[in-house]
């Protein structure tokens, strides 16, 4: 699930109904994970009913293995419980078992789990970043970042990505490890997540230089993971933010793929939980309405601009885009120290998450409504933004 150059799609072409529950069908070419599924429960299913359903699934799965000699499968793997009420689980089931689950009256729909992948491009090291200067200026071509000294102090940014090098000098001890849903290595062995984190809250490269960074790892060293694993990270971040104060929290997902109802529903659950969420529009130069979670309307969807205030040639576009942000040749932190340059809507998105954290530091109300604040303060700057797309470029309101 990554937007730097190209992403393996998680497309859902059509819905079929199997005795009541929708089983979402994947398009040709999607790299699904064999016999692995995401099950989402009906709205309003109680904790008691959910517990009963999961017990039934576990019992039925075990009986199939023992009594029927069914193909060995892992069964239920992870349970999703968002504070806003969204419930579900992922698991490893054969076709007969998943059809039994689909018949259960408490099940809303089922998606095949799918593999996701990022592909980063490193251009060069140790060059100045133009993105920060653009966020703090009403005119292109500046070299100074103007910002209020509060700099996002008191805010927390959840970076749902490949992890973050929390020891990097950019973070000055403000970065912590949250949780890991992809492997047993609590480190960023890819570099994408550290770069994103640096743009949000790095001392040199960050929009909100005093914000706290929390690493939520959902992609491995190759930038690869699963849709179910990403949703696990989304759930964890939402629940952790609720404990610490959702109104002071922002989340960044420089991830995505083709349309996924489960991904969109999880993104909506983050927003409904009171957490601002910035998501990459995608890098295929197509309408982002076909991308997830970018197409979820309750979040802030970000397209990428160039240093000359043009639409980056790779950036997705369309009515679902809320705002543009710098995303072409952006310098930020890399694991182990120093910096690197990356391009993509992945790089544009943390400028927006960082700006949300910056506004929280100024005392503005947090939550998904911050996207409206960001749009109100944005400037009309993007030439040829794409059909039906806003030309608004983010600005921190410094007045410079």
UniProtKB/Swiss-Prot annotation:
The active site is at 161 (charge relay system), 192 (charge relay system), 346 (charge relay system). GO terms for molecular function: serine-type endopeptidase activity. Residues 129-400 form the Peptidase S8 domain. CDD domains: Peptidases_S8_PCSK9_ProteinaseK_like (cd04077). InterPro entries: PCSK9_ProteinaseK-like (IPR034193), Peptidase_S8/S53_dom (IPR000209), Peptidase_S8/S53_dom_sf (IPR036852), Peptidase_S8_His-AS (IPR022398), Peptidase_S8_Ser-AS (IPR023828), Peptidase_S8_subtilisin-like (IPR050131), Peptidase_S8_subtilisin-rel (IPR015500), S8pro/Inhibitor_I9 (IPR010259). Secreted subtilisin-like serine protease with keratinolytic activity that contributes to pathogenicity. This is Subtilisin-like protease 7. The gene is SUB7.
């Amino acid at each position: 699930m990554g937007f730097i150059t190209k992403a393996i799609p998680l497309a859902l072409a059509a819905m079929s109904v199997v005795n009541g529950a929708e089983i979402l069908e994947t398009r040709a070419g999607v790299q699904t994970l064999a016999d692995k599924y995401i099950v989402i429960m009906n709205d309003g299913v109680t904790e008691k009913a959910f517990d009963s359903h999961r017990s039934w699934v576990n019992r039925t799965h075990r009986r199939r293995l023992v009594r029927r000699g069914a193909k060995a499968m892992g069964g239920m793997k992870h349970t999703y419980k968002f504070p806003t009420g969204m419930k579900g689980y992922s698991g490893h089931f054969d076709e007969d078992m998943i059809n039994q689950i689909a018949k259960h009256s408490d099940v809303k729909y089922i998606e095949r789990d799918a593999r996701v992948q990022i592909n980063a491009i490193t251009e060069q090291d140790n060059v100045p970043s133009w993105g920060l200067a653009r966020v703090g200026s009403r005119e292109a071509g500046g070299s100074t970042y103007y910002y209020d000294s509060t700099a996002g102090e008191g805010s927390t940014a959840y970076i749902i990505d490949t992890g973050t090098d929390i020891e990097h000098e950019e973070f000055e001890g403000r970065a912590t490890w949250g949780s890991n849903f992809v492997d047993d290595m609590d480190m960023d062995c890819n570099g994408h997540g550290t770069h994103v984190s640096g743009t949000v809250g790095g001392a040199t490269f960050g929009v909100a230089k005093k914000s706290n960074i929390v690493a939520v790892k959902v992609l491995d060293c190759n930038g690869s993971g699963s849709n179910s694993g990403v949703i696990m990270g989304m759930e964890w971040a939402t629940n952790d933010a609720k404990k610490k104060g959702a109104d002071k929290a922002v989340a960044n997902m420089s991830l995505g793929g083709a349309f996924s109802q489960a991904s969109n529903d999880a993104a909506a659950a983050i927003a409904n939980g009171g957490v601002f969420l910035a998501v990459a529009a995608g890098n295929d130069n197509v309408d982002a309405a076909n991308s997830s979670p970018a197409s979820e309307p309750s979040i802030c969807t970000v397209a990428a601009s160039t240093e000359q205030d043009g639409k980056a040639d790779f950036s997705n576009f369309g009515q679902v885009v809320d705002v543009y942000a710098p995303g072409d040749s952006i310098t930020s932190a890399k694991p182990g120290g120093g910096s690197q340059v990356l391009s993509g809507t992945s790089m544009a998105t943390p400028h927006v998450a960082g700006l949300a954290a910056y506004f929280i530091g100024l005392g503005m109300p947090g939550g998904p409504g911050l996207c409206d604040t960001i749009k109100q303060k944005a400037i009309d700057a993007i030439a040829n933004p794409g059909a039906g797309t806003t030309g608004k470029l983010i600005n921190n309101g410094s007045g410079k």
